């Protein structure tokens, strides 16, 4: 039995899996070895053969979960984990060679903590426009800038995190949050789990020296993608509030009307600007307001139709 496991779920990851799998092949093995679990979440591209061809070079178990949803896929993989530490990541992440050894060392050095996060930095697959570096929120790319040490649960992010198996216990990822095939999904898939674990008494630690690279594709370097991300994150904040009691309070109607009026005024003022960054910054609040509104409406409908 392996000493620790690495688990990720992938849907149509053919564009980013090759560099990720190359990096996984170069990993230093921790004492006791390791197991890699990849869950193909209904891919329609060449993800399945890409994974199969690496099984001879990696301690890789490939599972299939056709029901769409990242958390659905992760839950399907949890039954296959081995060892006392589980590292979670995504299909577009390049870890450093000492990744497994570093997480093992960290877990051994911090016995009072059960949830661990590493730093995340972007690896641009195309040069980012200047306005993105100036104006785009780093969180939209899962780009972290935290100090090492104890940290609050919301700062543990899915591309680079580990959880003690004993803390995980019978907990599973909530399948009603996170990527699910819809453009307007609610973000926060791993955060929801970490918040539950923290509520059960498990503490979080961040290690700034365990750095994984997040592959950023050209399609993510557009205002359209970033605004969709703003919308999704706003939905996620409200969804987390419903699931964990940790979301934003509802605005009084008059205040909400005022926020909309201000957002529309800024958008109109900047619509003819020659600076795409200025246009994005003007459009972002409106995208977030719409995400917040749509999620609250969806929850209200759910309550009305509940038995």
Task: Identify the role of each PLM range.
Residues 13-26:
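Short, well-formed alpha-helical segments that are part of the catalytic scaffolds
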Residues 40-49, 93:
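A conserved acidic beta->alpha catalytic loop
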Residues 65-81:
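Glycine-rich, basic loop-to-helix element that forms the pyrophosphate-binding segment
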Residues 86:
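Short aromatic/hydrophobic "clamp" motif used to bind/position activated sugar donors
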Residues 98-131:
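Conserved donor NDP-sugar-binding/catalytic core segment of glycosyltransferases
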Residues 135-154:
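Short, flexible, basic/aromatic active-site loop/helix in glycosyltransferases
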Residues 160-163, 167, 171, 179-210:
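A short, conserved alpha-helix in the catalytic core of glycosyltransferases
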Residues 228-235, 245-307:
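Non-catalytic, C-terminal membrane-associated alpha-helical segments of glycosyltransferases
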